[in-house]
Amino acid sequence: MTQFDKQYNSIIKDIINNGISDEEFDVRTKWDSDGTPAHTLSVISKQMRFDNSEVPILTTKKVAWKTAIKELLWIWQLKSNDVNDLNMMGVHIWDQWKQEDGTIGHAYGFQLGKKNRSLNGEKVDQVDYLLHQLKNNPSSRRHITMLWNPDELDAMALTPCVYETQWYVKHGKLHLEVRARSNDMALGNPFNVFQYNVLQRMIAQVTGYELGEYIFNIGDCHVYTRHIDNLKIQMEREQFEAPELWINPEVKDFYDFTIDDFKLINYKHGDKLLFEVAV
């Protein structure tokens, strides 16, 4: 049993047994297949903590880990909002939110790429500022990136679910705390938890720190009603030992990472489970 499997199953069980339904409300989300309202059961304010002795990825079902990393590179490295850039990587998970101009508006990578921080007399974006500050001002309590920009929320195809990171350097270790305003536990959470841990490992490597603790906070923690049956099946499945994530140790620049610099070794998992998408 992995740390992630254990915490994940505990939260799913809590939601199914104690979650509050939103069926009395008109909801924004609709089922992609038929356009009917996509209702949820939810609980609020959940936290997952990992000591990073193992990579947090589910073993009770197959997680498309390469797709998760490609999405991460699209947002954090390319700082792109262009869905075509993601399609070029063979990834189509954002196609439902693609606008007429081919982008997701001013969301995700667009916010990270805005040059709105001052550094040595120049304007830099959030990622470059973070990397510089972690190396040169490690004791700062201001190592934060923010995707939730109130001035531009209406210009986003989808407001960010994972919206904030805060980084801490303590005794030579790089700790990461992530905040998600909302998490779809069947589809979004397994991706997000894994990919932001990969981000932590990447940034620790290029800044020269050891890997510290990883904390993932969720505001609205929910399960869509059409996902419940398959989640119950998933919770009863055999759990395996965590795999090993290999990251090419030769990469010293954050922008030099490619998908070929990652390998998931000995990833044993249950069969893939299909969960319908709500948009």
UniProtKB/Swiss-Prot annotation:
It catalyses: dUMP + (6R)-5,10-methylene-5,6,7,8-tetrahydrofolate = 7,8-dihydrofolate + dTMP. DUMP binds at R141, R142, R181, S182, N183, D184, N192, H222, V223, Y224. Thermostable. Active at 46 degrees Celsius. GO terms for biological process: dTMP biosynthetic process; dTTP biosynthetic process; methylation. It comes from the Bacteria. One of its GO terms (cellular component) is cytosol. (6R)-5,10-methylene-5,6,7,8-tetrahydrofolate binds at D184, A278. InterPro entries: Thymidate_synth/dCMP_Mease (IPR045097), Thymidate_synth/dCMP_Mease_dom (IPR023451), Thymidate_synth/dCMP_Mease_sf (IPR036926), Thymidylate_synthase (IPR000398), Thymidylate_synthase_AS (IPR020940). Pfam families: Thymidylat_synt. Keywords: Cytoplasm, Methyltransferase, Nucleotide biosynthesis, Transferase. Signal peptide: none annotated. The active site is at C161. Transmembrane segments: none annotated. One of its GO terms (molecular function) is thymidylate synthase activity. Its main location: cytoplasm. Pathway: Pyrimidine metabolism; dTTP biosynthesis. It is found in: Cytoplasm. It is an enzyme of class 2 (transferase). Its EC number is 2.1.1.45. Catalyzes the reductive methylation of 2'-deoxyuridine-5'-monophosphate (dUMP) to 2'-deoxythymidine-5'-monophosphate (dTMP) while utilizing 5,10-methylenetetrahydrofolate (mTHF) as the methyl donor and reductant in the reaction, yielding dihydrofolate (DHF) as a by-product. This enzymatic reaction provides an intracellular de novo source of dTMP, an essential precursor for DNA biosynthesis. B.subtilis strain 168 possesses two thymidylate synthases, a major form ThyA and a minor form ThyB. Belongs to the thymidylate synthase family. Bacterial-type ThyA subfamily. Homodimer. This is Thymidylate synthase 1. It comes from Bacillus subtilis (strain 168). The gene is thyA1.
